């Protein structure tokens, strides 16, 4: 019975804890086979019968330690590690590692995959497979490009400096010197003769000077043709017709005032009245809707001709009816 202060432990009791029923059984399959081969009870296993004569004892393992480990050997792990390191060192010395010379020899003994495929019995020699996979004939730069390796910048700079030095040396060595048999006077005489034989370059200059003038004339002609086309267009004619109607509608009271002023003594002359009527008509015409289309001076003459016969007709009617005199407002 355990003490009250101790930890409670579960214990399992079996009928045969030492497994004596199995050890005392002589009809086991393994024992029969060993007896057929010359073994008997009390002898050890092995060729010289030096093995254990008793059965292996079973021990209950209730911890996380390795097989065969006990609490007494917990502090000996450093010694175990040292023994393991010594064992590895002994194995390395016995078998021996490969030296650097052997690795260099292996690198030199490179084989061609293409030749190996030709020799093989299975005949797997196809050009598109073997030649593309055979890297023995490739240079270091090609392999670096394939596998994506980058070289140091120092090596690239050294290569550039060496190439530039070689170019300078080649340029110095490949310079050629020519000696002419002509004298200085003969050389210049030859050059002057060549210059005289060349065609004069003044003609193309005159052509170039004439071309801008011709271009300007062509532009003016194109503009005039475009203006005539616009004037002859039906839209432009309709606009002019509307303008004339507006001018006549707005010019009616202005013409009446002018005729009345002519009948008054000391009134303005016909030319002054016509000029005033034209100016008033122009003021009326220049409305905000039609500010862009300003009438040309040629149309003023036509307007004067149209205004004069109307004035004559109005004078004939005014002779018959009495006219009231009105003062004219002067705009300042």
UniProtKB/Swiss-Prot annotation:
A motif (TBM) lies at residues 291-301. PROSITE patterns: G_PATCH. Residues 254-328 are annotated as: Telomerase inhibitory domain (TID). Residues 26-72 form the G-patch domain. It is found in: Nucleus; Nucleus, Nucleolus; Chromosome, Telomere; Chromosome, Centromere, Kinetochore. Residues 307-322 have a biased composition (Basic and acidic residues). The modification Phosphoserine is found at residues 233, 269, 274, 277. One of its GO terms (molecular function) is telomerase inhibitor activity. Keywords: Centromere, Chromosome, Kinetochore, Nucleus, Phosphoprotein, Telomere, Tumor suppressor. The keyword Phosphoprotein applies. Microtubule-binding protein essential for faithful chromosome segregation. Mediates TRF1 and TERT accumulation in nucleolus and enhances TRF1 binding to telomeres. Inhibits telomerase activity. May inhibit cell proliferation and act as tumor suppressor. This is PIN2/TERF1-interacting telomerase inhibitor 1. It comes from Mus musculus. The gene is Pinx1.
């Amino acid at each position: 019975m355990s003490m009250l202060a101790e930890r409670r432990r579960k214990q399992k009791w079996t009928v045969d804890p030492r497994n004596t029923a199995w050890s005392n059984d002589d009809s086991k399959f393994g024992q029969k086979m060993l007896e057929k081969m010359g073994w008997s009870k009390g002898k050890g296993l092995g060729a010289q019968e030096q093995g254990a004569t008793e059965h292996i004892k079973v021990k209950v393992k209730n911890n996380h330690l390795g097989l065969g480990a006990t609490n007494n050997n917990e502090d000996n792990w450093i010694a175990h590690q040292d023994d393991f390191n010594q064992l590895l060192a002994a194995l390395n010395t016995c078998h021996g590692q490969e030296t650097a010379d052997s690795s260099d020899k292996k690198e030199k003994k490179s084989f061609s995959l293409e030749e190996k495929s030709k020799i093989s019995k299975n005949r797997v020699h196809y050009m598109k497979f073997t030649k593309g996979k055979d890297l023995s004939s490739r240079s270091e730069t090609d392999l670096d490009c394939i596998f994506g390796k980058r070289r140091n910048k120092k090596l690239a700079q050294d290569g550039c400096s060496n190439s530039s030095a070689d170019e300078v040396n080649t340029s110095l060595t490949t310079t050629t010197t020519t000696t002419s048999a002509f004298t200085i006077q003969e050389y210049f005489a030859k050059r002057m003769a060549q210059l005289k034989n060349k065609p004069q370059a003044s003609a193309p200059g005159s052509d170039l000077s004439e071309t801008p003038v011709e271009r300007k004339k062509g532009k003016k002609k194109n503009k005039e043709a475009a203006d005539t086309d616009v004037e002859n267009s039906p839209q432009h004619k309709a606009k002019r017709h509307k303008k004339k109607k507006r001018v006549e509608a707005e010019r009616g009271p202005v013409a009446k005032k002018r005729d009345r002023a002519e009948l008054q003594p000391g009134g303005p002359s016909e030319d002054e009245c016509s000029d005033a009527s034209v100016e008033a008509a122009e003021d009326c015409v220049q409305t905000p809707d039609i500010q862009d289309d300003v009438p040309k001076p040629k149309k003023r003459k036509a307007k004067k001709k149209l205004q004069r016969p109307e004035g004559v007709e109005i004078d004939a009617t005014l002779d018959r009816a009495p006219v009231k005199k009105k003062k004219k407002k002067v705009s300042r």
